[in-house]
């Protein structure tokens, strides 16, 4: 509103001043409300953007959570598989140490549920089964042969063992290899 407009209407200067003062107060309120509205619009826009970002991130978080769970499961399966392989290797090695002729055949006759590693990393439950199996099905295992006497060899033409044999000679070396 302008002063000239009010004076053209026939108002005296005191009336124009009081109308302009009231108009100024109203304009300040209006401008304050307008600034508040603009700030709220800006805040609303920022919040809308944040909500959209959070929606996008929540989808990413869900995907990441699923990936983490899958990786945990894969890791658990790999650990179980590694433990099973370690147990299988230890069982096979022990079976061979017991002198089994066919490790697969012996392994098939074992109760694998009773075979475990104890807290110290030693196999439990296997040795008893192998001893029992060796007693009942001894044909699966090689015979325990006692160590025999060394072969007695005679040097050519001497008639006695190692008589006249020089330690560096070829004949002595052959005899020592045979006796070992």
UniProtKB/Swiss-Prot annotation:
Under Pfam families, the record lists: Phage_scaffold
List where the protein spans the membrane.
none
Family annotation (InterPro entries)? SCAF
Could you name the domain of life of the organism this protein comes from?
Viruses
Q: Does the keyword Transcription regulation apply?
A: no
Which BP terms in the Gene Ontology apply to this protein? viral capsid assembly
Q: Which UniProt keywords apply?
A: Viral capsid assembly, Viral release from host cell
Instruction: Report the protein's function.
Output: Scaffolding protein involved in the icosahedric procapsid assembly. Coassembles with the capsid proteins to form the procapsid, in which the scaffolding protein is found within the external shell of icosahedrally arranged capsid protein subunits. In a subsequent step the scaffolding protein molecules are released from the procapsid.
Quaternary form? Homodimer.
The UniProt similarity line reads:
Belongs to the SPP1-like scaffolding protein family.
- Annotated protein name in UniProt: Capsid assembly scaffolding protein
Gene that encodes the chain: g20
